[in-house]
Amino acid sequence: MDEAKYFVNTKIYTRPSGSFIHRPFDGGVEIKAGSSPSSVITRQTRKYFRYQSGKGIQCSLAINFNPPVLVRTLQSAGSSTCTVKTQYPHGITEGCSFRIEGVTNDTTYNGTFTVASVTDDFIFTYTAGGTPSAVTAQGNIQFHAKSWSGAQVRGGMFDYQNGFFYEFDGTHMYCVRRSSTLQISGTATVTNGSGLITGDETSWTSTLAVGDMTVIRGQSYKVVKITNNASISVQPAYRGTSASGVIVTKTVDTKVRQDSWNIDPCDGTGKFGFNLDVDKIQMAYFDYSWYGAGKIRFGFKDQNGQVKYVHDFKHNNLLTEAYFRSGNLPGRYEIENTGSPTIIPNLFHWGT
C-alpha cells in the first residue's frame, strides 16, 4: 500500500482580550481594551444623531477616565514589602507608578508607590516607605494608576472619520477634533480585495505616515506600509469597487492639551477655579454648530455643579474648507492601544 498523507484544514483566529462589563451596582459600563498591541475597543450608539441646519447639538456624558481597582487583601509580613491581591485583574506591570488609598488601620500602606513585582493577574507587590505595624490592612482599599503610555481613553461624539472628544493618554488630557476633509494630492488606483494602493502623481512619503488613517470612497483604511511616493499598503483590504482616479483624504486629529485650553485649563488657576481630577467621575459636556464653519465647545460641570465650557475650536475665517465631512455623529467611548501599553487602562461610563 502506497504511503498516504492526510491533512485537516485548520484555521487560527485571534481572540481579543478586551471586554465590556455591565456594572449592576450603579448602572454603568466598564470598558477594557486588553493588553494586545494596537487593539481598539469601542462602544458606540447605534444611531447617528442628525444635524439640522440652524440648530446646535449638545452632548453630556458621565465618565471616569482613570477608575480605581478594588483591592481584596493587602498584607505585609513584617517588612516594607507589601503584597496586593485585587478583586479583578489589575492590569499593571513592573515599574508602574500607582496610588493606593483607603487603608484605615495603618496609613503606612497608603501613598504613591512603584510596582516592585507582578506575581499574576491578581497579585503584585510594592515597597512602602516603612514597615507597617499592621500585618493586614483594613478599610475600603483601592488604587489608581498614576500614569501610563501606549493607550488612549476617549469619550465624546465621533467615529473613525469625524467628531470631537476628550482623550486621556495616561499623562495629559486633550480636547480633540477629528476631521477627514484633507485631500491628498494626486489620485489613486484601487482594486477590490487588495490592500495595495497605487498612486498617480502622488507624494505619499511626505503626505502620509505609517499608522495614518485615510478615507477612500467613504471607507476608512489604516496605512501600514509606504513603499514609495506611488505605492502604499492599507488595512483592511479595499472593500469597494475597483477604480482609478480616486481621491484619497487623510483623517487628522487636532489635539489641544489641557494646559493650552483657551478658556480655562482646569488646573485651579483659570477663570472658573475648576481643578480637573481624572481619577474622579466627571460630567463632560460638548456642543457644536456645523454649517461647515461653526464652533465646537468642550466643558465640564465645575465644583459648584454648573456647566462651564473650558475650550472651543473656532473655524470661520480660519480654515479654508468645512471642518467635518458630515455633521451627523454618534455618541462613542473608546480605548485604543497605540502600541504595547504599560498598563491595561479602562474607563467607566454611565448614561448612554
What are these regions, as identified by a protein language model?
Residues 48-58, 90, 273-280:
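Extracellular/lumenal carbohydrate-interaction signature centered on repeated Trp-anchored short motifs
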Residues 113-115, 311-318:
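Solvent-exposed serine/threonine-rich low-complexity stretches and specific carbohydrate-binding patches
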Residues 1-69, 144-181, 253-259, 315-352:
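Low-complexity, Ser/Thr/Pro/Gly-rich disordered linker/stalk regions
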Residues 253-283:
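Short, aromatic/His-centered strand-loop micro-motif at the edge of beta-sheets
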Residues 156, 296-312:
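Amphipathic alpha-helical scaffolding segments
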Residues 70-96, 101-144, 182-252:
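Small/polar beta-strand repeat architecture
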